[in-house]
């Protein structure tokens, strides 16, 4: 079903990502990564903030912003992970994307650490987190412009975090 939904999203100019998303200050903070990377952990620690998903997020273009820039929106989907409750059927403009992995090599005491990711590397990592399993030439020709727009429109960074109670306070400071 996710593969079919991905094909439909692609035809509409969007993508389905293996990602979670939490709405903070009116913007979706998207965290994309493979199974076991901490998507559900971050979603569960969101407190009272709306969780769009802990497993898969649809990303699609919306109206152009006031400054003429592309605005991308994150949408909740019916495909959730372990969070069967507390996920909202809503959307929000994408504020930032964090690429996450199961790596927890932080210095003790730091709730999180971020690093810039090059646009080319961002495209590659996001491509790996789509649900498109057979990438034909036609699919790639449709997908790459979407990913390029995504990378050009939204700040994408790598996030390593320790799942402490104050991890979102640290993320909010980083997104400030």
Which residue stretches match the model-derived regions?
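N-terminal pre-Walker A segment at the start of P-loop NTPase domains
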Residues: 1-16
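Glycine-rich, often acidic-flanked micro-motifs
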Residues: 18-20, 24-34, 45-176
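Conserved glycine(s) of the Walker
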Residues: 37-39
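Hydrophobic positions on the alpha1 helix immediately C-terminal to the Walker A/P-loop
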Residues: 42
